[in-house]
UniProtKB/Swiss-Prot annotation:
InterPro entries named among the record's database cross-references: Creatin/AminoP/Spt16_N, Creatinase/aminopeptidase-like, Creatinase_N, Pept_M24, Pept_M24B, Peptidase_M24_C, X-Pro_aminopeptidase_P
Reactions mediated catalytically: Release of any N-terminal amino acid, including proline, that is linked to proline, even from a dipeptide or tripeptide
GO CC terms, sorted: cytoplasm
Cofactor note text: Binds 2 manganese ions per subunit.
Any coiled-coil regions, as ranges: none
Protein name as annotated: Probable Xaa-Pro aminopeptidase P
Function in brief: Catalyzes the removal of a penultimate prolyl residue from the N-termini of peptides.
UniProt-listed Enzyme Commission number(s): 3.4.11.9
Cofactor(s) in the UniProt record: Mn(2+)
Lineage: Eukaryota, Fungi, Dikarya, Basidiomycota, Agaricomycotina
Alphabetized UniProt keyword annotations: Aminopeptidase, Hydrolase, Manganese, Metal-binding, Metalloprotease, Protease
Stored Gene3D superfamilies: Creatinase/methionine aminopeptidase superfamily (3.90.230.10), Creatinase/prolidase N-terminal domain (3.40.350.10)
GO biological process per UniProt: proteolysis
Amino acid sequence: MWRAIWLRISEKGLRRPPPPSLRTVTTSCTTMGADGVHTVNTTERLAKLRELMKQHSVQAFVVPSEDQHSSEYLANCDKRRAFISGFDGSAGCAIITTDKAYLFTDGRYFLQAEKQLDKNWKLMKQGLPDVPTWQDFLYKNLGPHTQIGIDATLLAASDAESLTKQLTPKYSKLVSLKENLVDVVWGEDRPSRPQNSVFHLDVKYSGQSHLDKIATLREEMKKKKAEAIVVTMLDEVAWLLNLRGSDIEYNPVFFAYAVVTMDEVILFIDSAQLDDTARHNLEHVYTMPYEAIFEHLNSLSRTLELDRDSKVLIGDRASLAVADAIGKDNYTIVRSPIADLKAIKNKTELEGFRQSHIRDGAALVRYFAWLEEQLNHGTVINESQGADKLEAFRSELDLFRGLSFDTISGTGPNGAIIHYKPDPNDCAIIKKDQVYLCDSGGQFLDGTTDVTRTWHFGTPTDEEKRAFTRVLQGHIAIDTAVFPNGTTGYVIDAFARRALWQDGLDYRHGTGHGVGHFLNVHEGPHGIGVRIALNNTPLKAGMTVSNEPGYYADGKFGIRIESIVLVREVKTPNNFGDKGYLGFENVTMCPIHKNLVDVSLLNEQEKKWLDEYHAETWDKVSPLLKGDTRALEWLRRECSPL
């Protein structure tokens, strides 16, 4: 999983620190079996945790994935759920009772969790029939009068409010503990919080000054009659102030809060982290120590002299601790206006996406051409070595600052593990007679990339070709979709699945996620998928989103085709309802493997799309490959017409 090439983000790039060793092996609920080579033995950790629970008079303890900023990706010091359970996927929640331990996660991680959890854990496969969410489990499955221990800095205030309402009729309640019990069990071995350098992102990349962004935010605050907004999400702080850091692996963010009023902006950060570029460009922004945030929030309502009609805004992922510090009657939970502003990229950011993806395409072509040559020569290459080589090619690109996530390099059955991460000490050899799935991305000063391509360097089976072609048809259906303004990703998700459904196939993940601009590779609030929450955010011109349908045959192979698309306005012959219509612009430039295509399944429009996509890829990427005969000839072959 963890590879030897480390990078550091500052003006010099992103560094990957050595991680803790957590690499460890369906019905809707699965009790894990005996410990295996990939399993962390959690017996002692759970025993210590339960003893602490007893001392604090709680009968259950909740260990969410997120940190106190509700981050999806975490610094090593915040990987509490991974420490206590052994499961290190990016999504999930652990609930420990006096005699049982439950791990809740979604379909992306079922196979991974089954491999990593030991016999102490029961896997709860969220999304399958009769499996509750972890929130529902607390009030539906636990008995009455249950004291449920939580860390208020890790639980969203919105979740706490709804849970409290549900638990009250059963005389159960959430108990905010002064210390995180998992941290106590972890003890001195728990890593310290990173405090890496923070730098200014020049306006030639961001396209808008931080002062303009703050002015726009204040206009949104006026609409909501707010005197202040507390910014808790790390990517929102970074975007608002045009700052970038490296406190969390793969994500150019840093630990900080911000409080914006009509008169001032305060950044709560360890000031020693700010380099000269950051200090010189933080005009009209005050700084205070990171740890001072809660004390400041305690006094905020008095300082602002809030009345019945004026409130402090907090986002819907802000923690219960933040809400409690402000005071019960002084805040309003809203969907973060910064999330909506950040989601729509400006012209500079959109052009950065185009250019960074073209450069990224050159690295991908070099890698796949190299890999095919090595396999044809009989060279033994394992999944981790392949990922390392791809990273090496990317590291040569202009404006590269590191990976945007850990490369998923999976051959054969490992490709069916949706978020598989190869362990250099225990991973498979890439074989010519197996399907190979590679999902990877980079962080660049002018954009963030995320691309998946699936290959077969030998002779694929009819089953593999048919499945790949159905996935391709879904990919094309999204790419060519035209829809009226006001349409959500929830509505168009079925376009990606239609061809798979014809064969009785499907996949257990969303079709698309938003992508940050030199920020987190997963960004909301929009996306394409079946989660009902995605029906709350219409797709708008300027948004970026992935297009990644897939199919996974457990124990055999995995297929995914992923490109990044920009939402754009399109001209249509008519304009019913004067709504205006939208479509997509594909910016990912990497061939789609024709060796896996069953051409007989494609209609003429789909064939035309594939040929035109390959012609565009050749035109844009080939100029970057001058002098690399191997890559050029490979690209020429892969981009030739059907």
